[in-house]
Swiss-Prot record:
PROSITE patterns: GLC_GALNAC_ISOMERASE (PS01161)
Record-linked Pfam families: Glucosamine_iso
Matches recorded under InterPro entries: Glc/Gal-6P_isomerase, Glucosamine6P_isomerase, Glucosamine6P_isomerase_CS, NagB/RpiA_transferase-like
UniProt key word Acetylation: yes
Self-association and partners: Homohexamer.
Source organism phylogeny: Eukaryota, Metazoa, Chordata, Craniata, Vertebrata
Keywords for the protein's UniProt record, in alphabetical order: Acetylation, Carbohydrate metabolism, Cytoplasm, Hydrolase, Isomerase, Phosphoprotein
Source organism (scientific name): Pongo abelii
Active-site positions on this chain: 72 (proton acceptor), 141 (for ring-opening step), 143 (proton acceptor), 148 (for ring-opening step)
Name the record gives this protein: Glucosamine-6-phosphate deaminase 1
Keyword Transport tagged: no
NCBIfam families: nagB (TIGR00502)
Gene name for this UniProt entry: GNPDA1
Top enzyme category: hydrolase
Regulation: Allosterically activated by N-acetylglucosamine-6-phosphate (GlcNAc6P).
Length: 289
């Protein structure tokens, strides 16, 4: 497990975006080998998405051969509703990059058979070869996706009733009116995310500090579902200083001492332009008479 500690939200967002960029470029995706990326919604990943869009517009990172799978979607909210996760992903990420719509996968909260929709989503992930990198965020109560406290740590994609804390937290997106907030959602399970070859969890802000403490310094507990990722062989937690306020000083000092090593994951920062230049140069035959 790695814990990346940056001073501010913007730095944490940029580090995460650089990491995703390097992972995609090093994977060298193509028509026969897509990079599969799990994605979250919410305010935490917005800074990361903005940097990824910037990389795309600069010609450093294409998404043509990337397939995405989103974590969750509300039940009963129209797809074109401004607060649906379809709308969120389109407005904040997908419409700004060159990803093909058929390569973006988001659960349908208006499906006739919701459990069948969840089962089909799991099959789509399998058909794509599994998730290479699943990016996630958490709530103040440590939930990841909509795996609320008490969720099974081996759960799969399913229908979930939202906890009151989550409904209250999401009311700000619905004019502050609780009656407008959906009470159910479709969500990937903890086990679904655990199946990914690598997991990166973004945790920023003092209001997430106790959840990070539970995730890092205490044992695995289904009341804090993010703690399950202690047992994943390749978990990267990316946080800002505010999120470390509940951690022990020696814990923070230990992981900060590893930053010189961990920063090598994003430095050098790879670019598709550089790889294409190297490829063209290596294909040139040396001059001969």
């Amino acid at each position: 497990m790695k814990l990346i500690i940056l001073e501010h939200y913007s730095q944490a967002s940029e580090w995460a975006a650089k990491y995703i960029r390097n992972r995609i470029i090093q994977f060298n995706p193509g028509p026969e080998k897509y990079f599969t990326l799990g994605l979250p919604t919410g305010s935490t990943p917005l800074g990361c998405y903005k940097k990824l869009i910037e990389y795309y517009k600069n010609g450093d990172l294409p998404f043509k051969y990337v397939k995405t799978f989103n974590m969750d979607e509300y039940v009963g909210l129209p797809r074109d509703h401004p607060e649906s996760y379809h709308s969120f992903m389109w407005n904040n990420f997908f419409k700004h990059i060159d990803i093909h719509p058929e390569n973006t996968h988001i659960l349908d909260g208006n499906a006739v058979d919701l459990q069948a929709e969840c089962d089909a989503f799991e099959e789509k992930i399998k058909a794509a070869g599994g998730i290479e990198l699943f990016v996630g965020g958490i709530g103040p109560d440590g939930h990841i996706a909509f795996n609320e406290p008490g969720s099974s740590l081996v759960s799969r994609t399913r229908v979930k009733t939202l906890a009151m804390d989550t409904i209250l937290a999401n009311a700000r997106f619905f004019d502050g009116e609780l009656t407008k907030v959906p009470t159910m959602a479709l969500t990937v399970g903890v086990g679904t995310v655990m199946d990914a070859r690598e997991v990166m969890i973004l945790i920023t802000g003092a209001h997430k500090a106790f959840a990070l403490y539970k995730a890092i310094e205490e044992g695995v507990n289904h009341m804090w579902t993010v703690s399950a990722f202690q047992q994943h062989p390749r978990t990267v937690f990316v946080c800002d200083e505010d999120a470390t306020l509940e951690l022990k000083v020696k814990t923070v000092k230990y992981f900060k001492g590893l930053m010189l090593v961990h920063n090598k994951l994003v430095d050098p920062l790879y670019s598709i332009k550089e790889k294409e230049t190297e490829k063209s140069q290596s294909s040139k035959k040396p001059y001969s008479d």
